[in-house]
């Protein structure tokens, strides 16, 4: 039997069950489950997440894209290294109208996480990014802070500038055509595996922190993509299945 204690609306509750699966951010588990062995606790605390960010812009029309004959742009030297029109969704018999005079959504992103895009990192750090050779975990921690501290207005200014620079030959006017901007900041974006450049060579096989950290503790099992060290939906599903079958 396991026992879970939680607070809701200022009241303390306690639930008993035959088993519990901890499937949140694995680095938080040592703070939730105090009974963990020290080796497992230390392994879970090594869990790290890559920083990611997804930006969506709502446009009045997408006529500028049509006039330019494009649906998206790769722009590695700009703040976002790619942006494109969101693919219209089909639901059952519903078919969206592909009318350039109608509103559309544009997604701006840096694939594989913010740290992989040098221009965005440099600008977020005010021209002074982490020096080459800085341990990956330190880079991620510093970048996390920068992403959270950057004002929405700073992102908005860069978005308007980038879209205008690329789309203005097609008649795009950011003041007229941008209806709304949504920025999803994921400072703890997605699970990471080990990195041979920075991590100990012995972190392989059964000694991998993800493997050590996901060991069953009585009637408690551990899941989430962190438990696989992979940022894949399939990995999260596999770990969830494993955790459930271990109970």
Regions found by a protein language model. Give the residues of each.
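Conserved flavin/dinucleotide-binding core of flavoenzymes
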Residues: 3-7, 58, 64-247
